[in-house]
Amino acid sequence: MSTVLTSVIGGARVPSGAGRLYRSTDPSRTTDVVAEVSLADADDLVRACEAARNAQDAWRDVPPPVRGQVVAAIGRLVEANKAALARVVTREVGKPYAEALGEVQEIADTCAFFLGEGRRLYGHTVPSEMPDKQLFTFRDPVGVVTAITAGNFPVAVPSWYIVPALLCGNAVVWKPAEYAAACAEAFYQVFAHAGLPDGVLNVVYADGPETFRGLERALVRGLVDKVGFTGSTEVGARIGELCGRHLQSPCLELGGKNPMVVTEDADLTLAVEGALFSGFGTAGQRCTSLGTAIVHESVRDEFVRLLDEATRAATVGDPAGDVLYGPLIDERFADGFEKVLGWIGPRHAVHGSSGTGRISPSNPRDGFDGDAEAGLYYHPVIVDGVRPDDELFLHETFGPIVGVAPYRTLDEAIALANAPGYGLSASIYTTDPAEVFAFRRRISAGMVSVNNSTSGAEAHLPFGGNGRSGNGGRQSGIWVLDQFTRWQSMNWDFSGRLQKAQMDVVEITPDLGFRL
């Protein structure tokens, strides 16, 4: 790029040169620099929170239906720039272009939902137990929202925070992933041209340690009222602890070890299709990616055979083409996946490709379509025979690898599904409604799919997890409004005298001894 990207605080660019320089590269051609970014420090994050605080009062006072019109304008701009934004996503994070188009559409869908919520930020009129007295409730914005997002969904997930936060009357400080800075810049430009006042949306390009230090200082100074974080369970726990010290409850959307239960009467062709998409789509780098397929022992061998066949037939390679998945997003994720591959032991049976590890001329994959030497491409891996005490069973892998474990009874399958302690997404393939509802009732996941994959979200359905996958907060739909507003109650006594609740209530005496 011809210019260095810098943070935007209060509508103004932070001068470049002061911060460390970070180069974001194309993971399919790692020598191709997509963006050069001047990284901000902790003080910059604090300044961004100050700018948001200064802008928030005026933004709060813009009537909600008008804020909804700004959201509508964002949605129209996203649709007008859909192809261009998707191309940036494909180039910078290696997401196949068809998937990138779907991700951009998710922003537009989110805007389409929330533009109407500007006219529906309803409170309630509540009857009082006193005469000549009325009770009301109101939704008020929380204030300043700091959103910290990962780069595997570099534009869709930020919209889940930023669109409803703005709609509710909050000002936002957004810290995107530095390895997805070009995506963040394009996203910000679309939002800025929708008419947002200066300071209402601020963007801070920073690394993790500086972000944490800045957030800590901003919380101490009372500049942040809500933190949203999408990322790893380990970092989410640290952010949760930090916010807890300031009596705040963050919105945490963390990792997943998402199970798929395949019963003895399941449609195996459909189950394999779901496993292929959720296990290897986006190179397994989704929080909702399939972790372990828990398959009834009577169909396990056939399931593994079919999944192996489908995975070997799938095209992996250049994300600009028609591929199942492209490269891993960044070197840091490739290094992490190399560690995961070390968890495969001699008692495991490995399927899915002509090799394991990084695809290269010396470790080729049949049907690969791309320049293997240029990018961060990895073989898909199916590991049969994983056990509950395996590292591969217990931990999120964030790469193109799927474990398979057998079960005998549904009780055993549910116990295995819950064992890793995550609780984001779970799936069951069955034709038995009783099994569906028994599974739904006892699975720990915040999202359950029936005869569908573990991956997939819609803008009007709550998204979020429990346990190691989050603290119970939900994104999307009307449910996210509770993250970005606080309820305020008001009582208005127009009787002209003091009426004391529970003490001055009119008593009506029933004859409870009456019998027919």
Task: Write out the residue ranges for each language-model feature.
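Residue-level signal for inorganic ion chemistry
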Residues: 31, 67, 89, 111, ...
